[in-house]
Regions:
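A Rossmann-like FAD-binding core segment of flavoenzymes
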Residues: 50-97, 165-210
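Conserved N-terminal glycine-rich FAD pyrophosphate-binding loop of Rossmann-like flavoproteins
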Residues: 33-51
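Rossmann-like dinucleotide/flavin-binding elements
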Residues: 1-35, 73, 101-186
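Surface-exposed beta-strand edges and their flanking turn/coil or helix-capping segments
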Residues: 41, 79, 95, 129-130, ...
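Electropositive phosphate-/nucleotide-binding environments in soluble metabolic enzymes
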Residues: 10-13, 46-50, 67, 89, ...
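Short secondary-structure boundary/capping segments
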Residues: 42-45, 110-112, 193-196
Length: 210
């Protein structure tokens, strides 16, 4: 069976790994030059993604097409005919859509001293893991873009991601850290991490970030 996977991020690679394990032929279409998706932009995840992708990279049943853009999809009998913007035509028995996500852009909070989590990661990454000297007081605001009138659902990731950012920060420096949250929704050992961070002086303040 020929399986076409749209998206070469962690979801697409995970799907490819399963399909290859079942001896199917797999083609991954990635809109950027290299697979990685959002994880490739997160310094602390990049190595882990590379290791994960390396497990299937040389599989003879796998084809990865970078800078791919789909312009047309037709259903023919039981197969899909896919045309790319460079004129290349592909045929697949199954299509998996793993097109990733678009990070929320908090325009209402924009400012010189306001960073999204991805931007914060990039700052540390560019400095080879060092925290800028003027980052001596840091506030993490949770639920930005969710738990609001327009989007009332919990993102289910920002609490865990913030704990990771706090841990990563404290491994590099000892700034004053305050976490502002609506509700804390952790998983497993993250509850113990929260207590450990509180014990080291990290402040957790219930607040409304909407």
């Amino acid at each position: 069976m020929n399986i076409l996977i749209i998206g070469g991020g962690i979801s697409g690679i995970s799907a490819a790994k399963v399909a290859l394990g079942e001896k199917h032929d797999v083609t991954i279409l990635e809109s950027t030059p290299e697979p990685g998706g959002l994880m490739a932009r997160i310094a602390n995840c990049r190595v882990g993604f590379k290791t994960f992708f390396d497990e299937i990279r040389d599989n003879e049943r796998l084809t990865v097409i970078g800078d791919a853009k789909i312009i047309k999809v037709d259903k023919k009998d039981k197969a899909f005919a896919v045309t790319l913007d460079n004129g290349r035509a592909l045929t697949a028995d199954r299509v998996v859509v793993a097109a990733g996500l678009t990070p929320y852009d908090p325009v209402e909070y924009k400012g010189k001293r306001v960073l999204t989590s991805l931007e914060y990661d990039a700052v540390i990454d560019q400095r080879q893991g060092e925290l800028p000297a003027d980052f001596n007081r840091i506030g993490f605001f949770l639920c930005v873009g969710s738990r609001s009138k327009d989007y009332p659902l919990c993102s289910s990731v920002c609490c865990s991601y913030t704990l990771r950012e706090v841990k990563w920060t404290l491994q590099r420096a000892k700034p004053e850290i305050t976490v502002f949250y609506n509700d804390l929704r952790f998983f497993g050992q993250e509850f113990y991490m929260e207590k450990a961070f509180r014990d080291t002086g990290v402040k957790f303040v219930r607040a409304n970030s909407r």
